[in-house]
Amino acid sequence: LKLRSRNFKQQLHSRRTHYSWLCDAAPMNPSFSSYLVNDVFGDPGLFVEVRWSKRALLFDLGHNDALGPTRLLRASDIFISHTHMDHFIGFDALLRVALGRGKTLRRHGPPGLIPNVQGKLHGYTWNLVDGYPLTITAHEFHPDGIQTATFLATDGFQRHDEPDAPLNGCTGQGPFTVFRDPMFTVQATALNHRIPSLAYALQEQFHVNFNKERLHEAGLPVGYWLKEVKQYFWEGQPDDFRFCATLYHEHHKETREFILGEIRERFVTITRGQKIAYVVDA
């Protein structure tokens, strides 16, 4: 099944929005597992699990009861297209399950996101949460730079503005980088919805494929240590990089030292990374 050369596009229509979910051709063992938060008549939203981790990304924050608390709490980074009600009403549900969890929730979105987050938080009384270690950051992306504000449960979610930062990858027009991780980047571009509405593209840097047959022939088990090896590749470690890994065999475990270049040569194939785009209301 040759998925690598194919694209598929699923266009979903509701009574209020034209919803486009584009998933680029992915490897047979994709790094991202994505699905819609609601059906075609519900609020727009896309939940993306980063496989083999406890991490997820959430695109838009509409009604999200279908996700449940466990999935919501995995989504430390949330990318908001705009703050119309059907894209932002789920803020309160996430806030409620995150209180007292010691988490940092990062929200990324268009101009106006910071005062809208502030307004949501000011809708409640916070005199009993001074011992709750919850931090919310909001990043607004403007043509001339990034504005950031932080809200802490320990002081009743007062607004703390941070210094502005330059926009990465853009001079005011076209795509710009919203979030960067060794494994992937999230880029955005502003569309016209009578307000700026951000469209997002999640791009894996590249995909690391392990040949399990060769690993087996070499007496090496699959397991968490391979995830660590992937991270070294995404971080750009050189071929002579040495590392130790704990290997779990059927009846024992051992710690061995490896050289990254030898792992690459014997067991690894690098292919194009997975890409997912999220576009609504334009």
Model-derived features: positions:
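Short, conserved secondary-structure transition motifs
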Residues: L113, H139-A149
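Active-site metal-binding motif and surrounding structural segment of the metallo-beta-lactamase
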Residues: H63-P110
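Intrinsically disordered, low-complexity segments enriched in serine/proline and basic residues
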Residues: L1-Q10
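Active-site catalytic pocket residues across diverse enzymes, especially alpha/beta-hydrolases
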Residues: L95-A98, L121-T125
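Conserved beta-strand hairpin/beta-sheet module of binuclear metal-dependent hydrolase folds
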Residues: Y19-L72, D77, T104, Y200-L202, ...
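Metal-dependent phosphodiesterase/nuclease catalytic metal-binding core
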Residues: Q11, C23, D161-A282
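A glycine-rich helix N-cap at a beta->alpha junction
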Residues: W126-F141
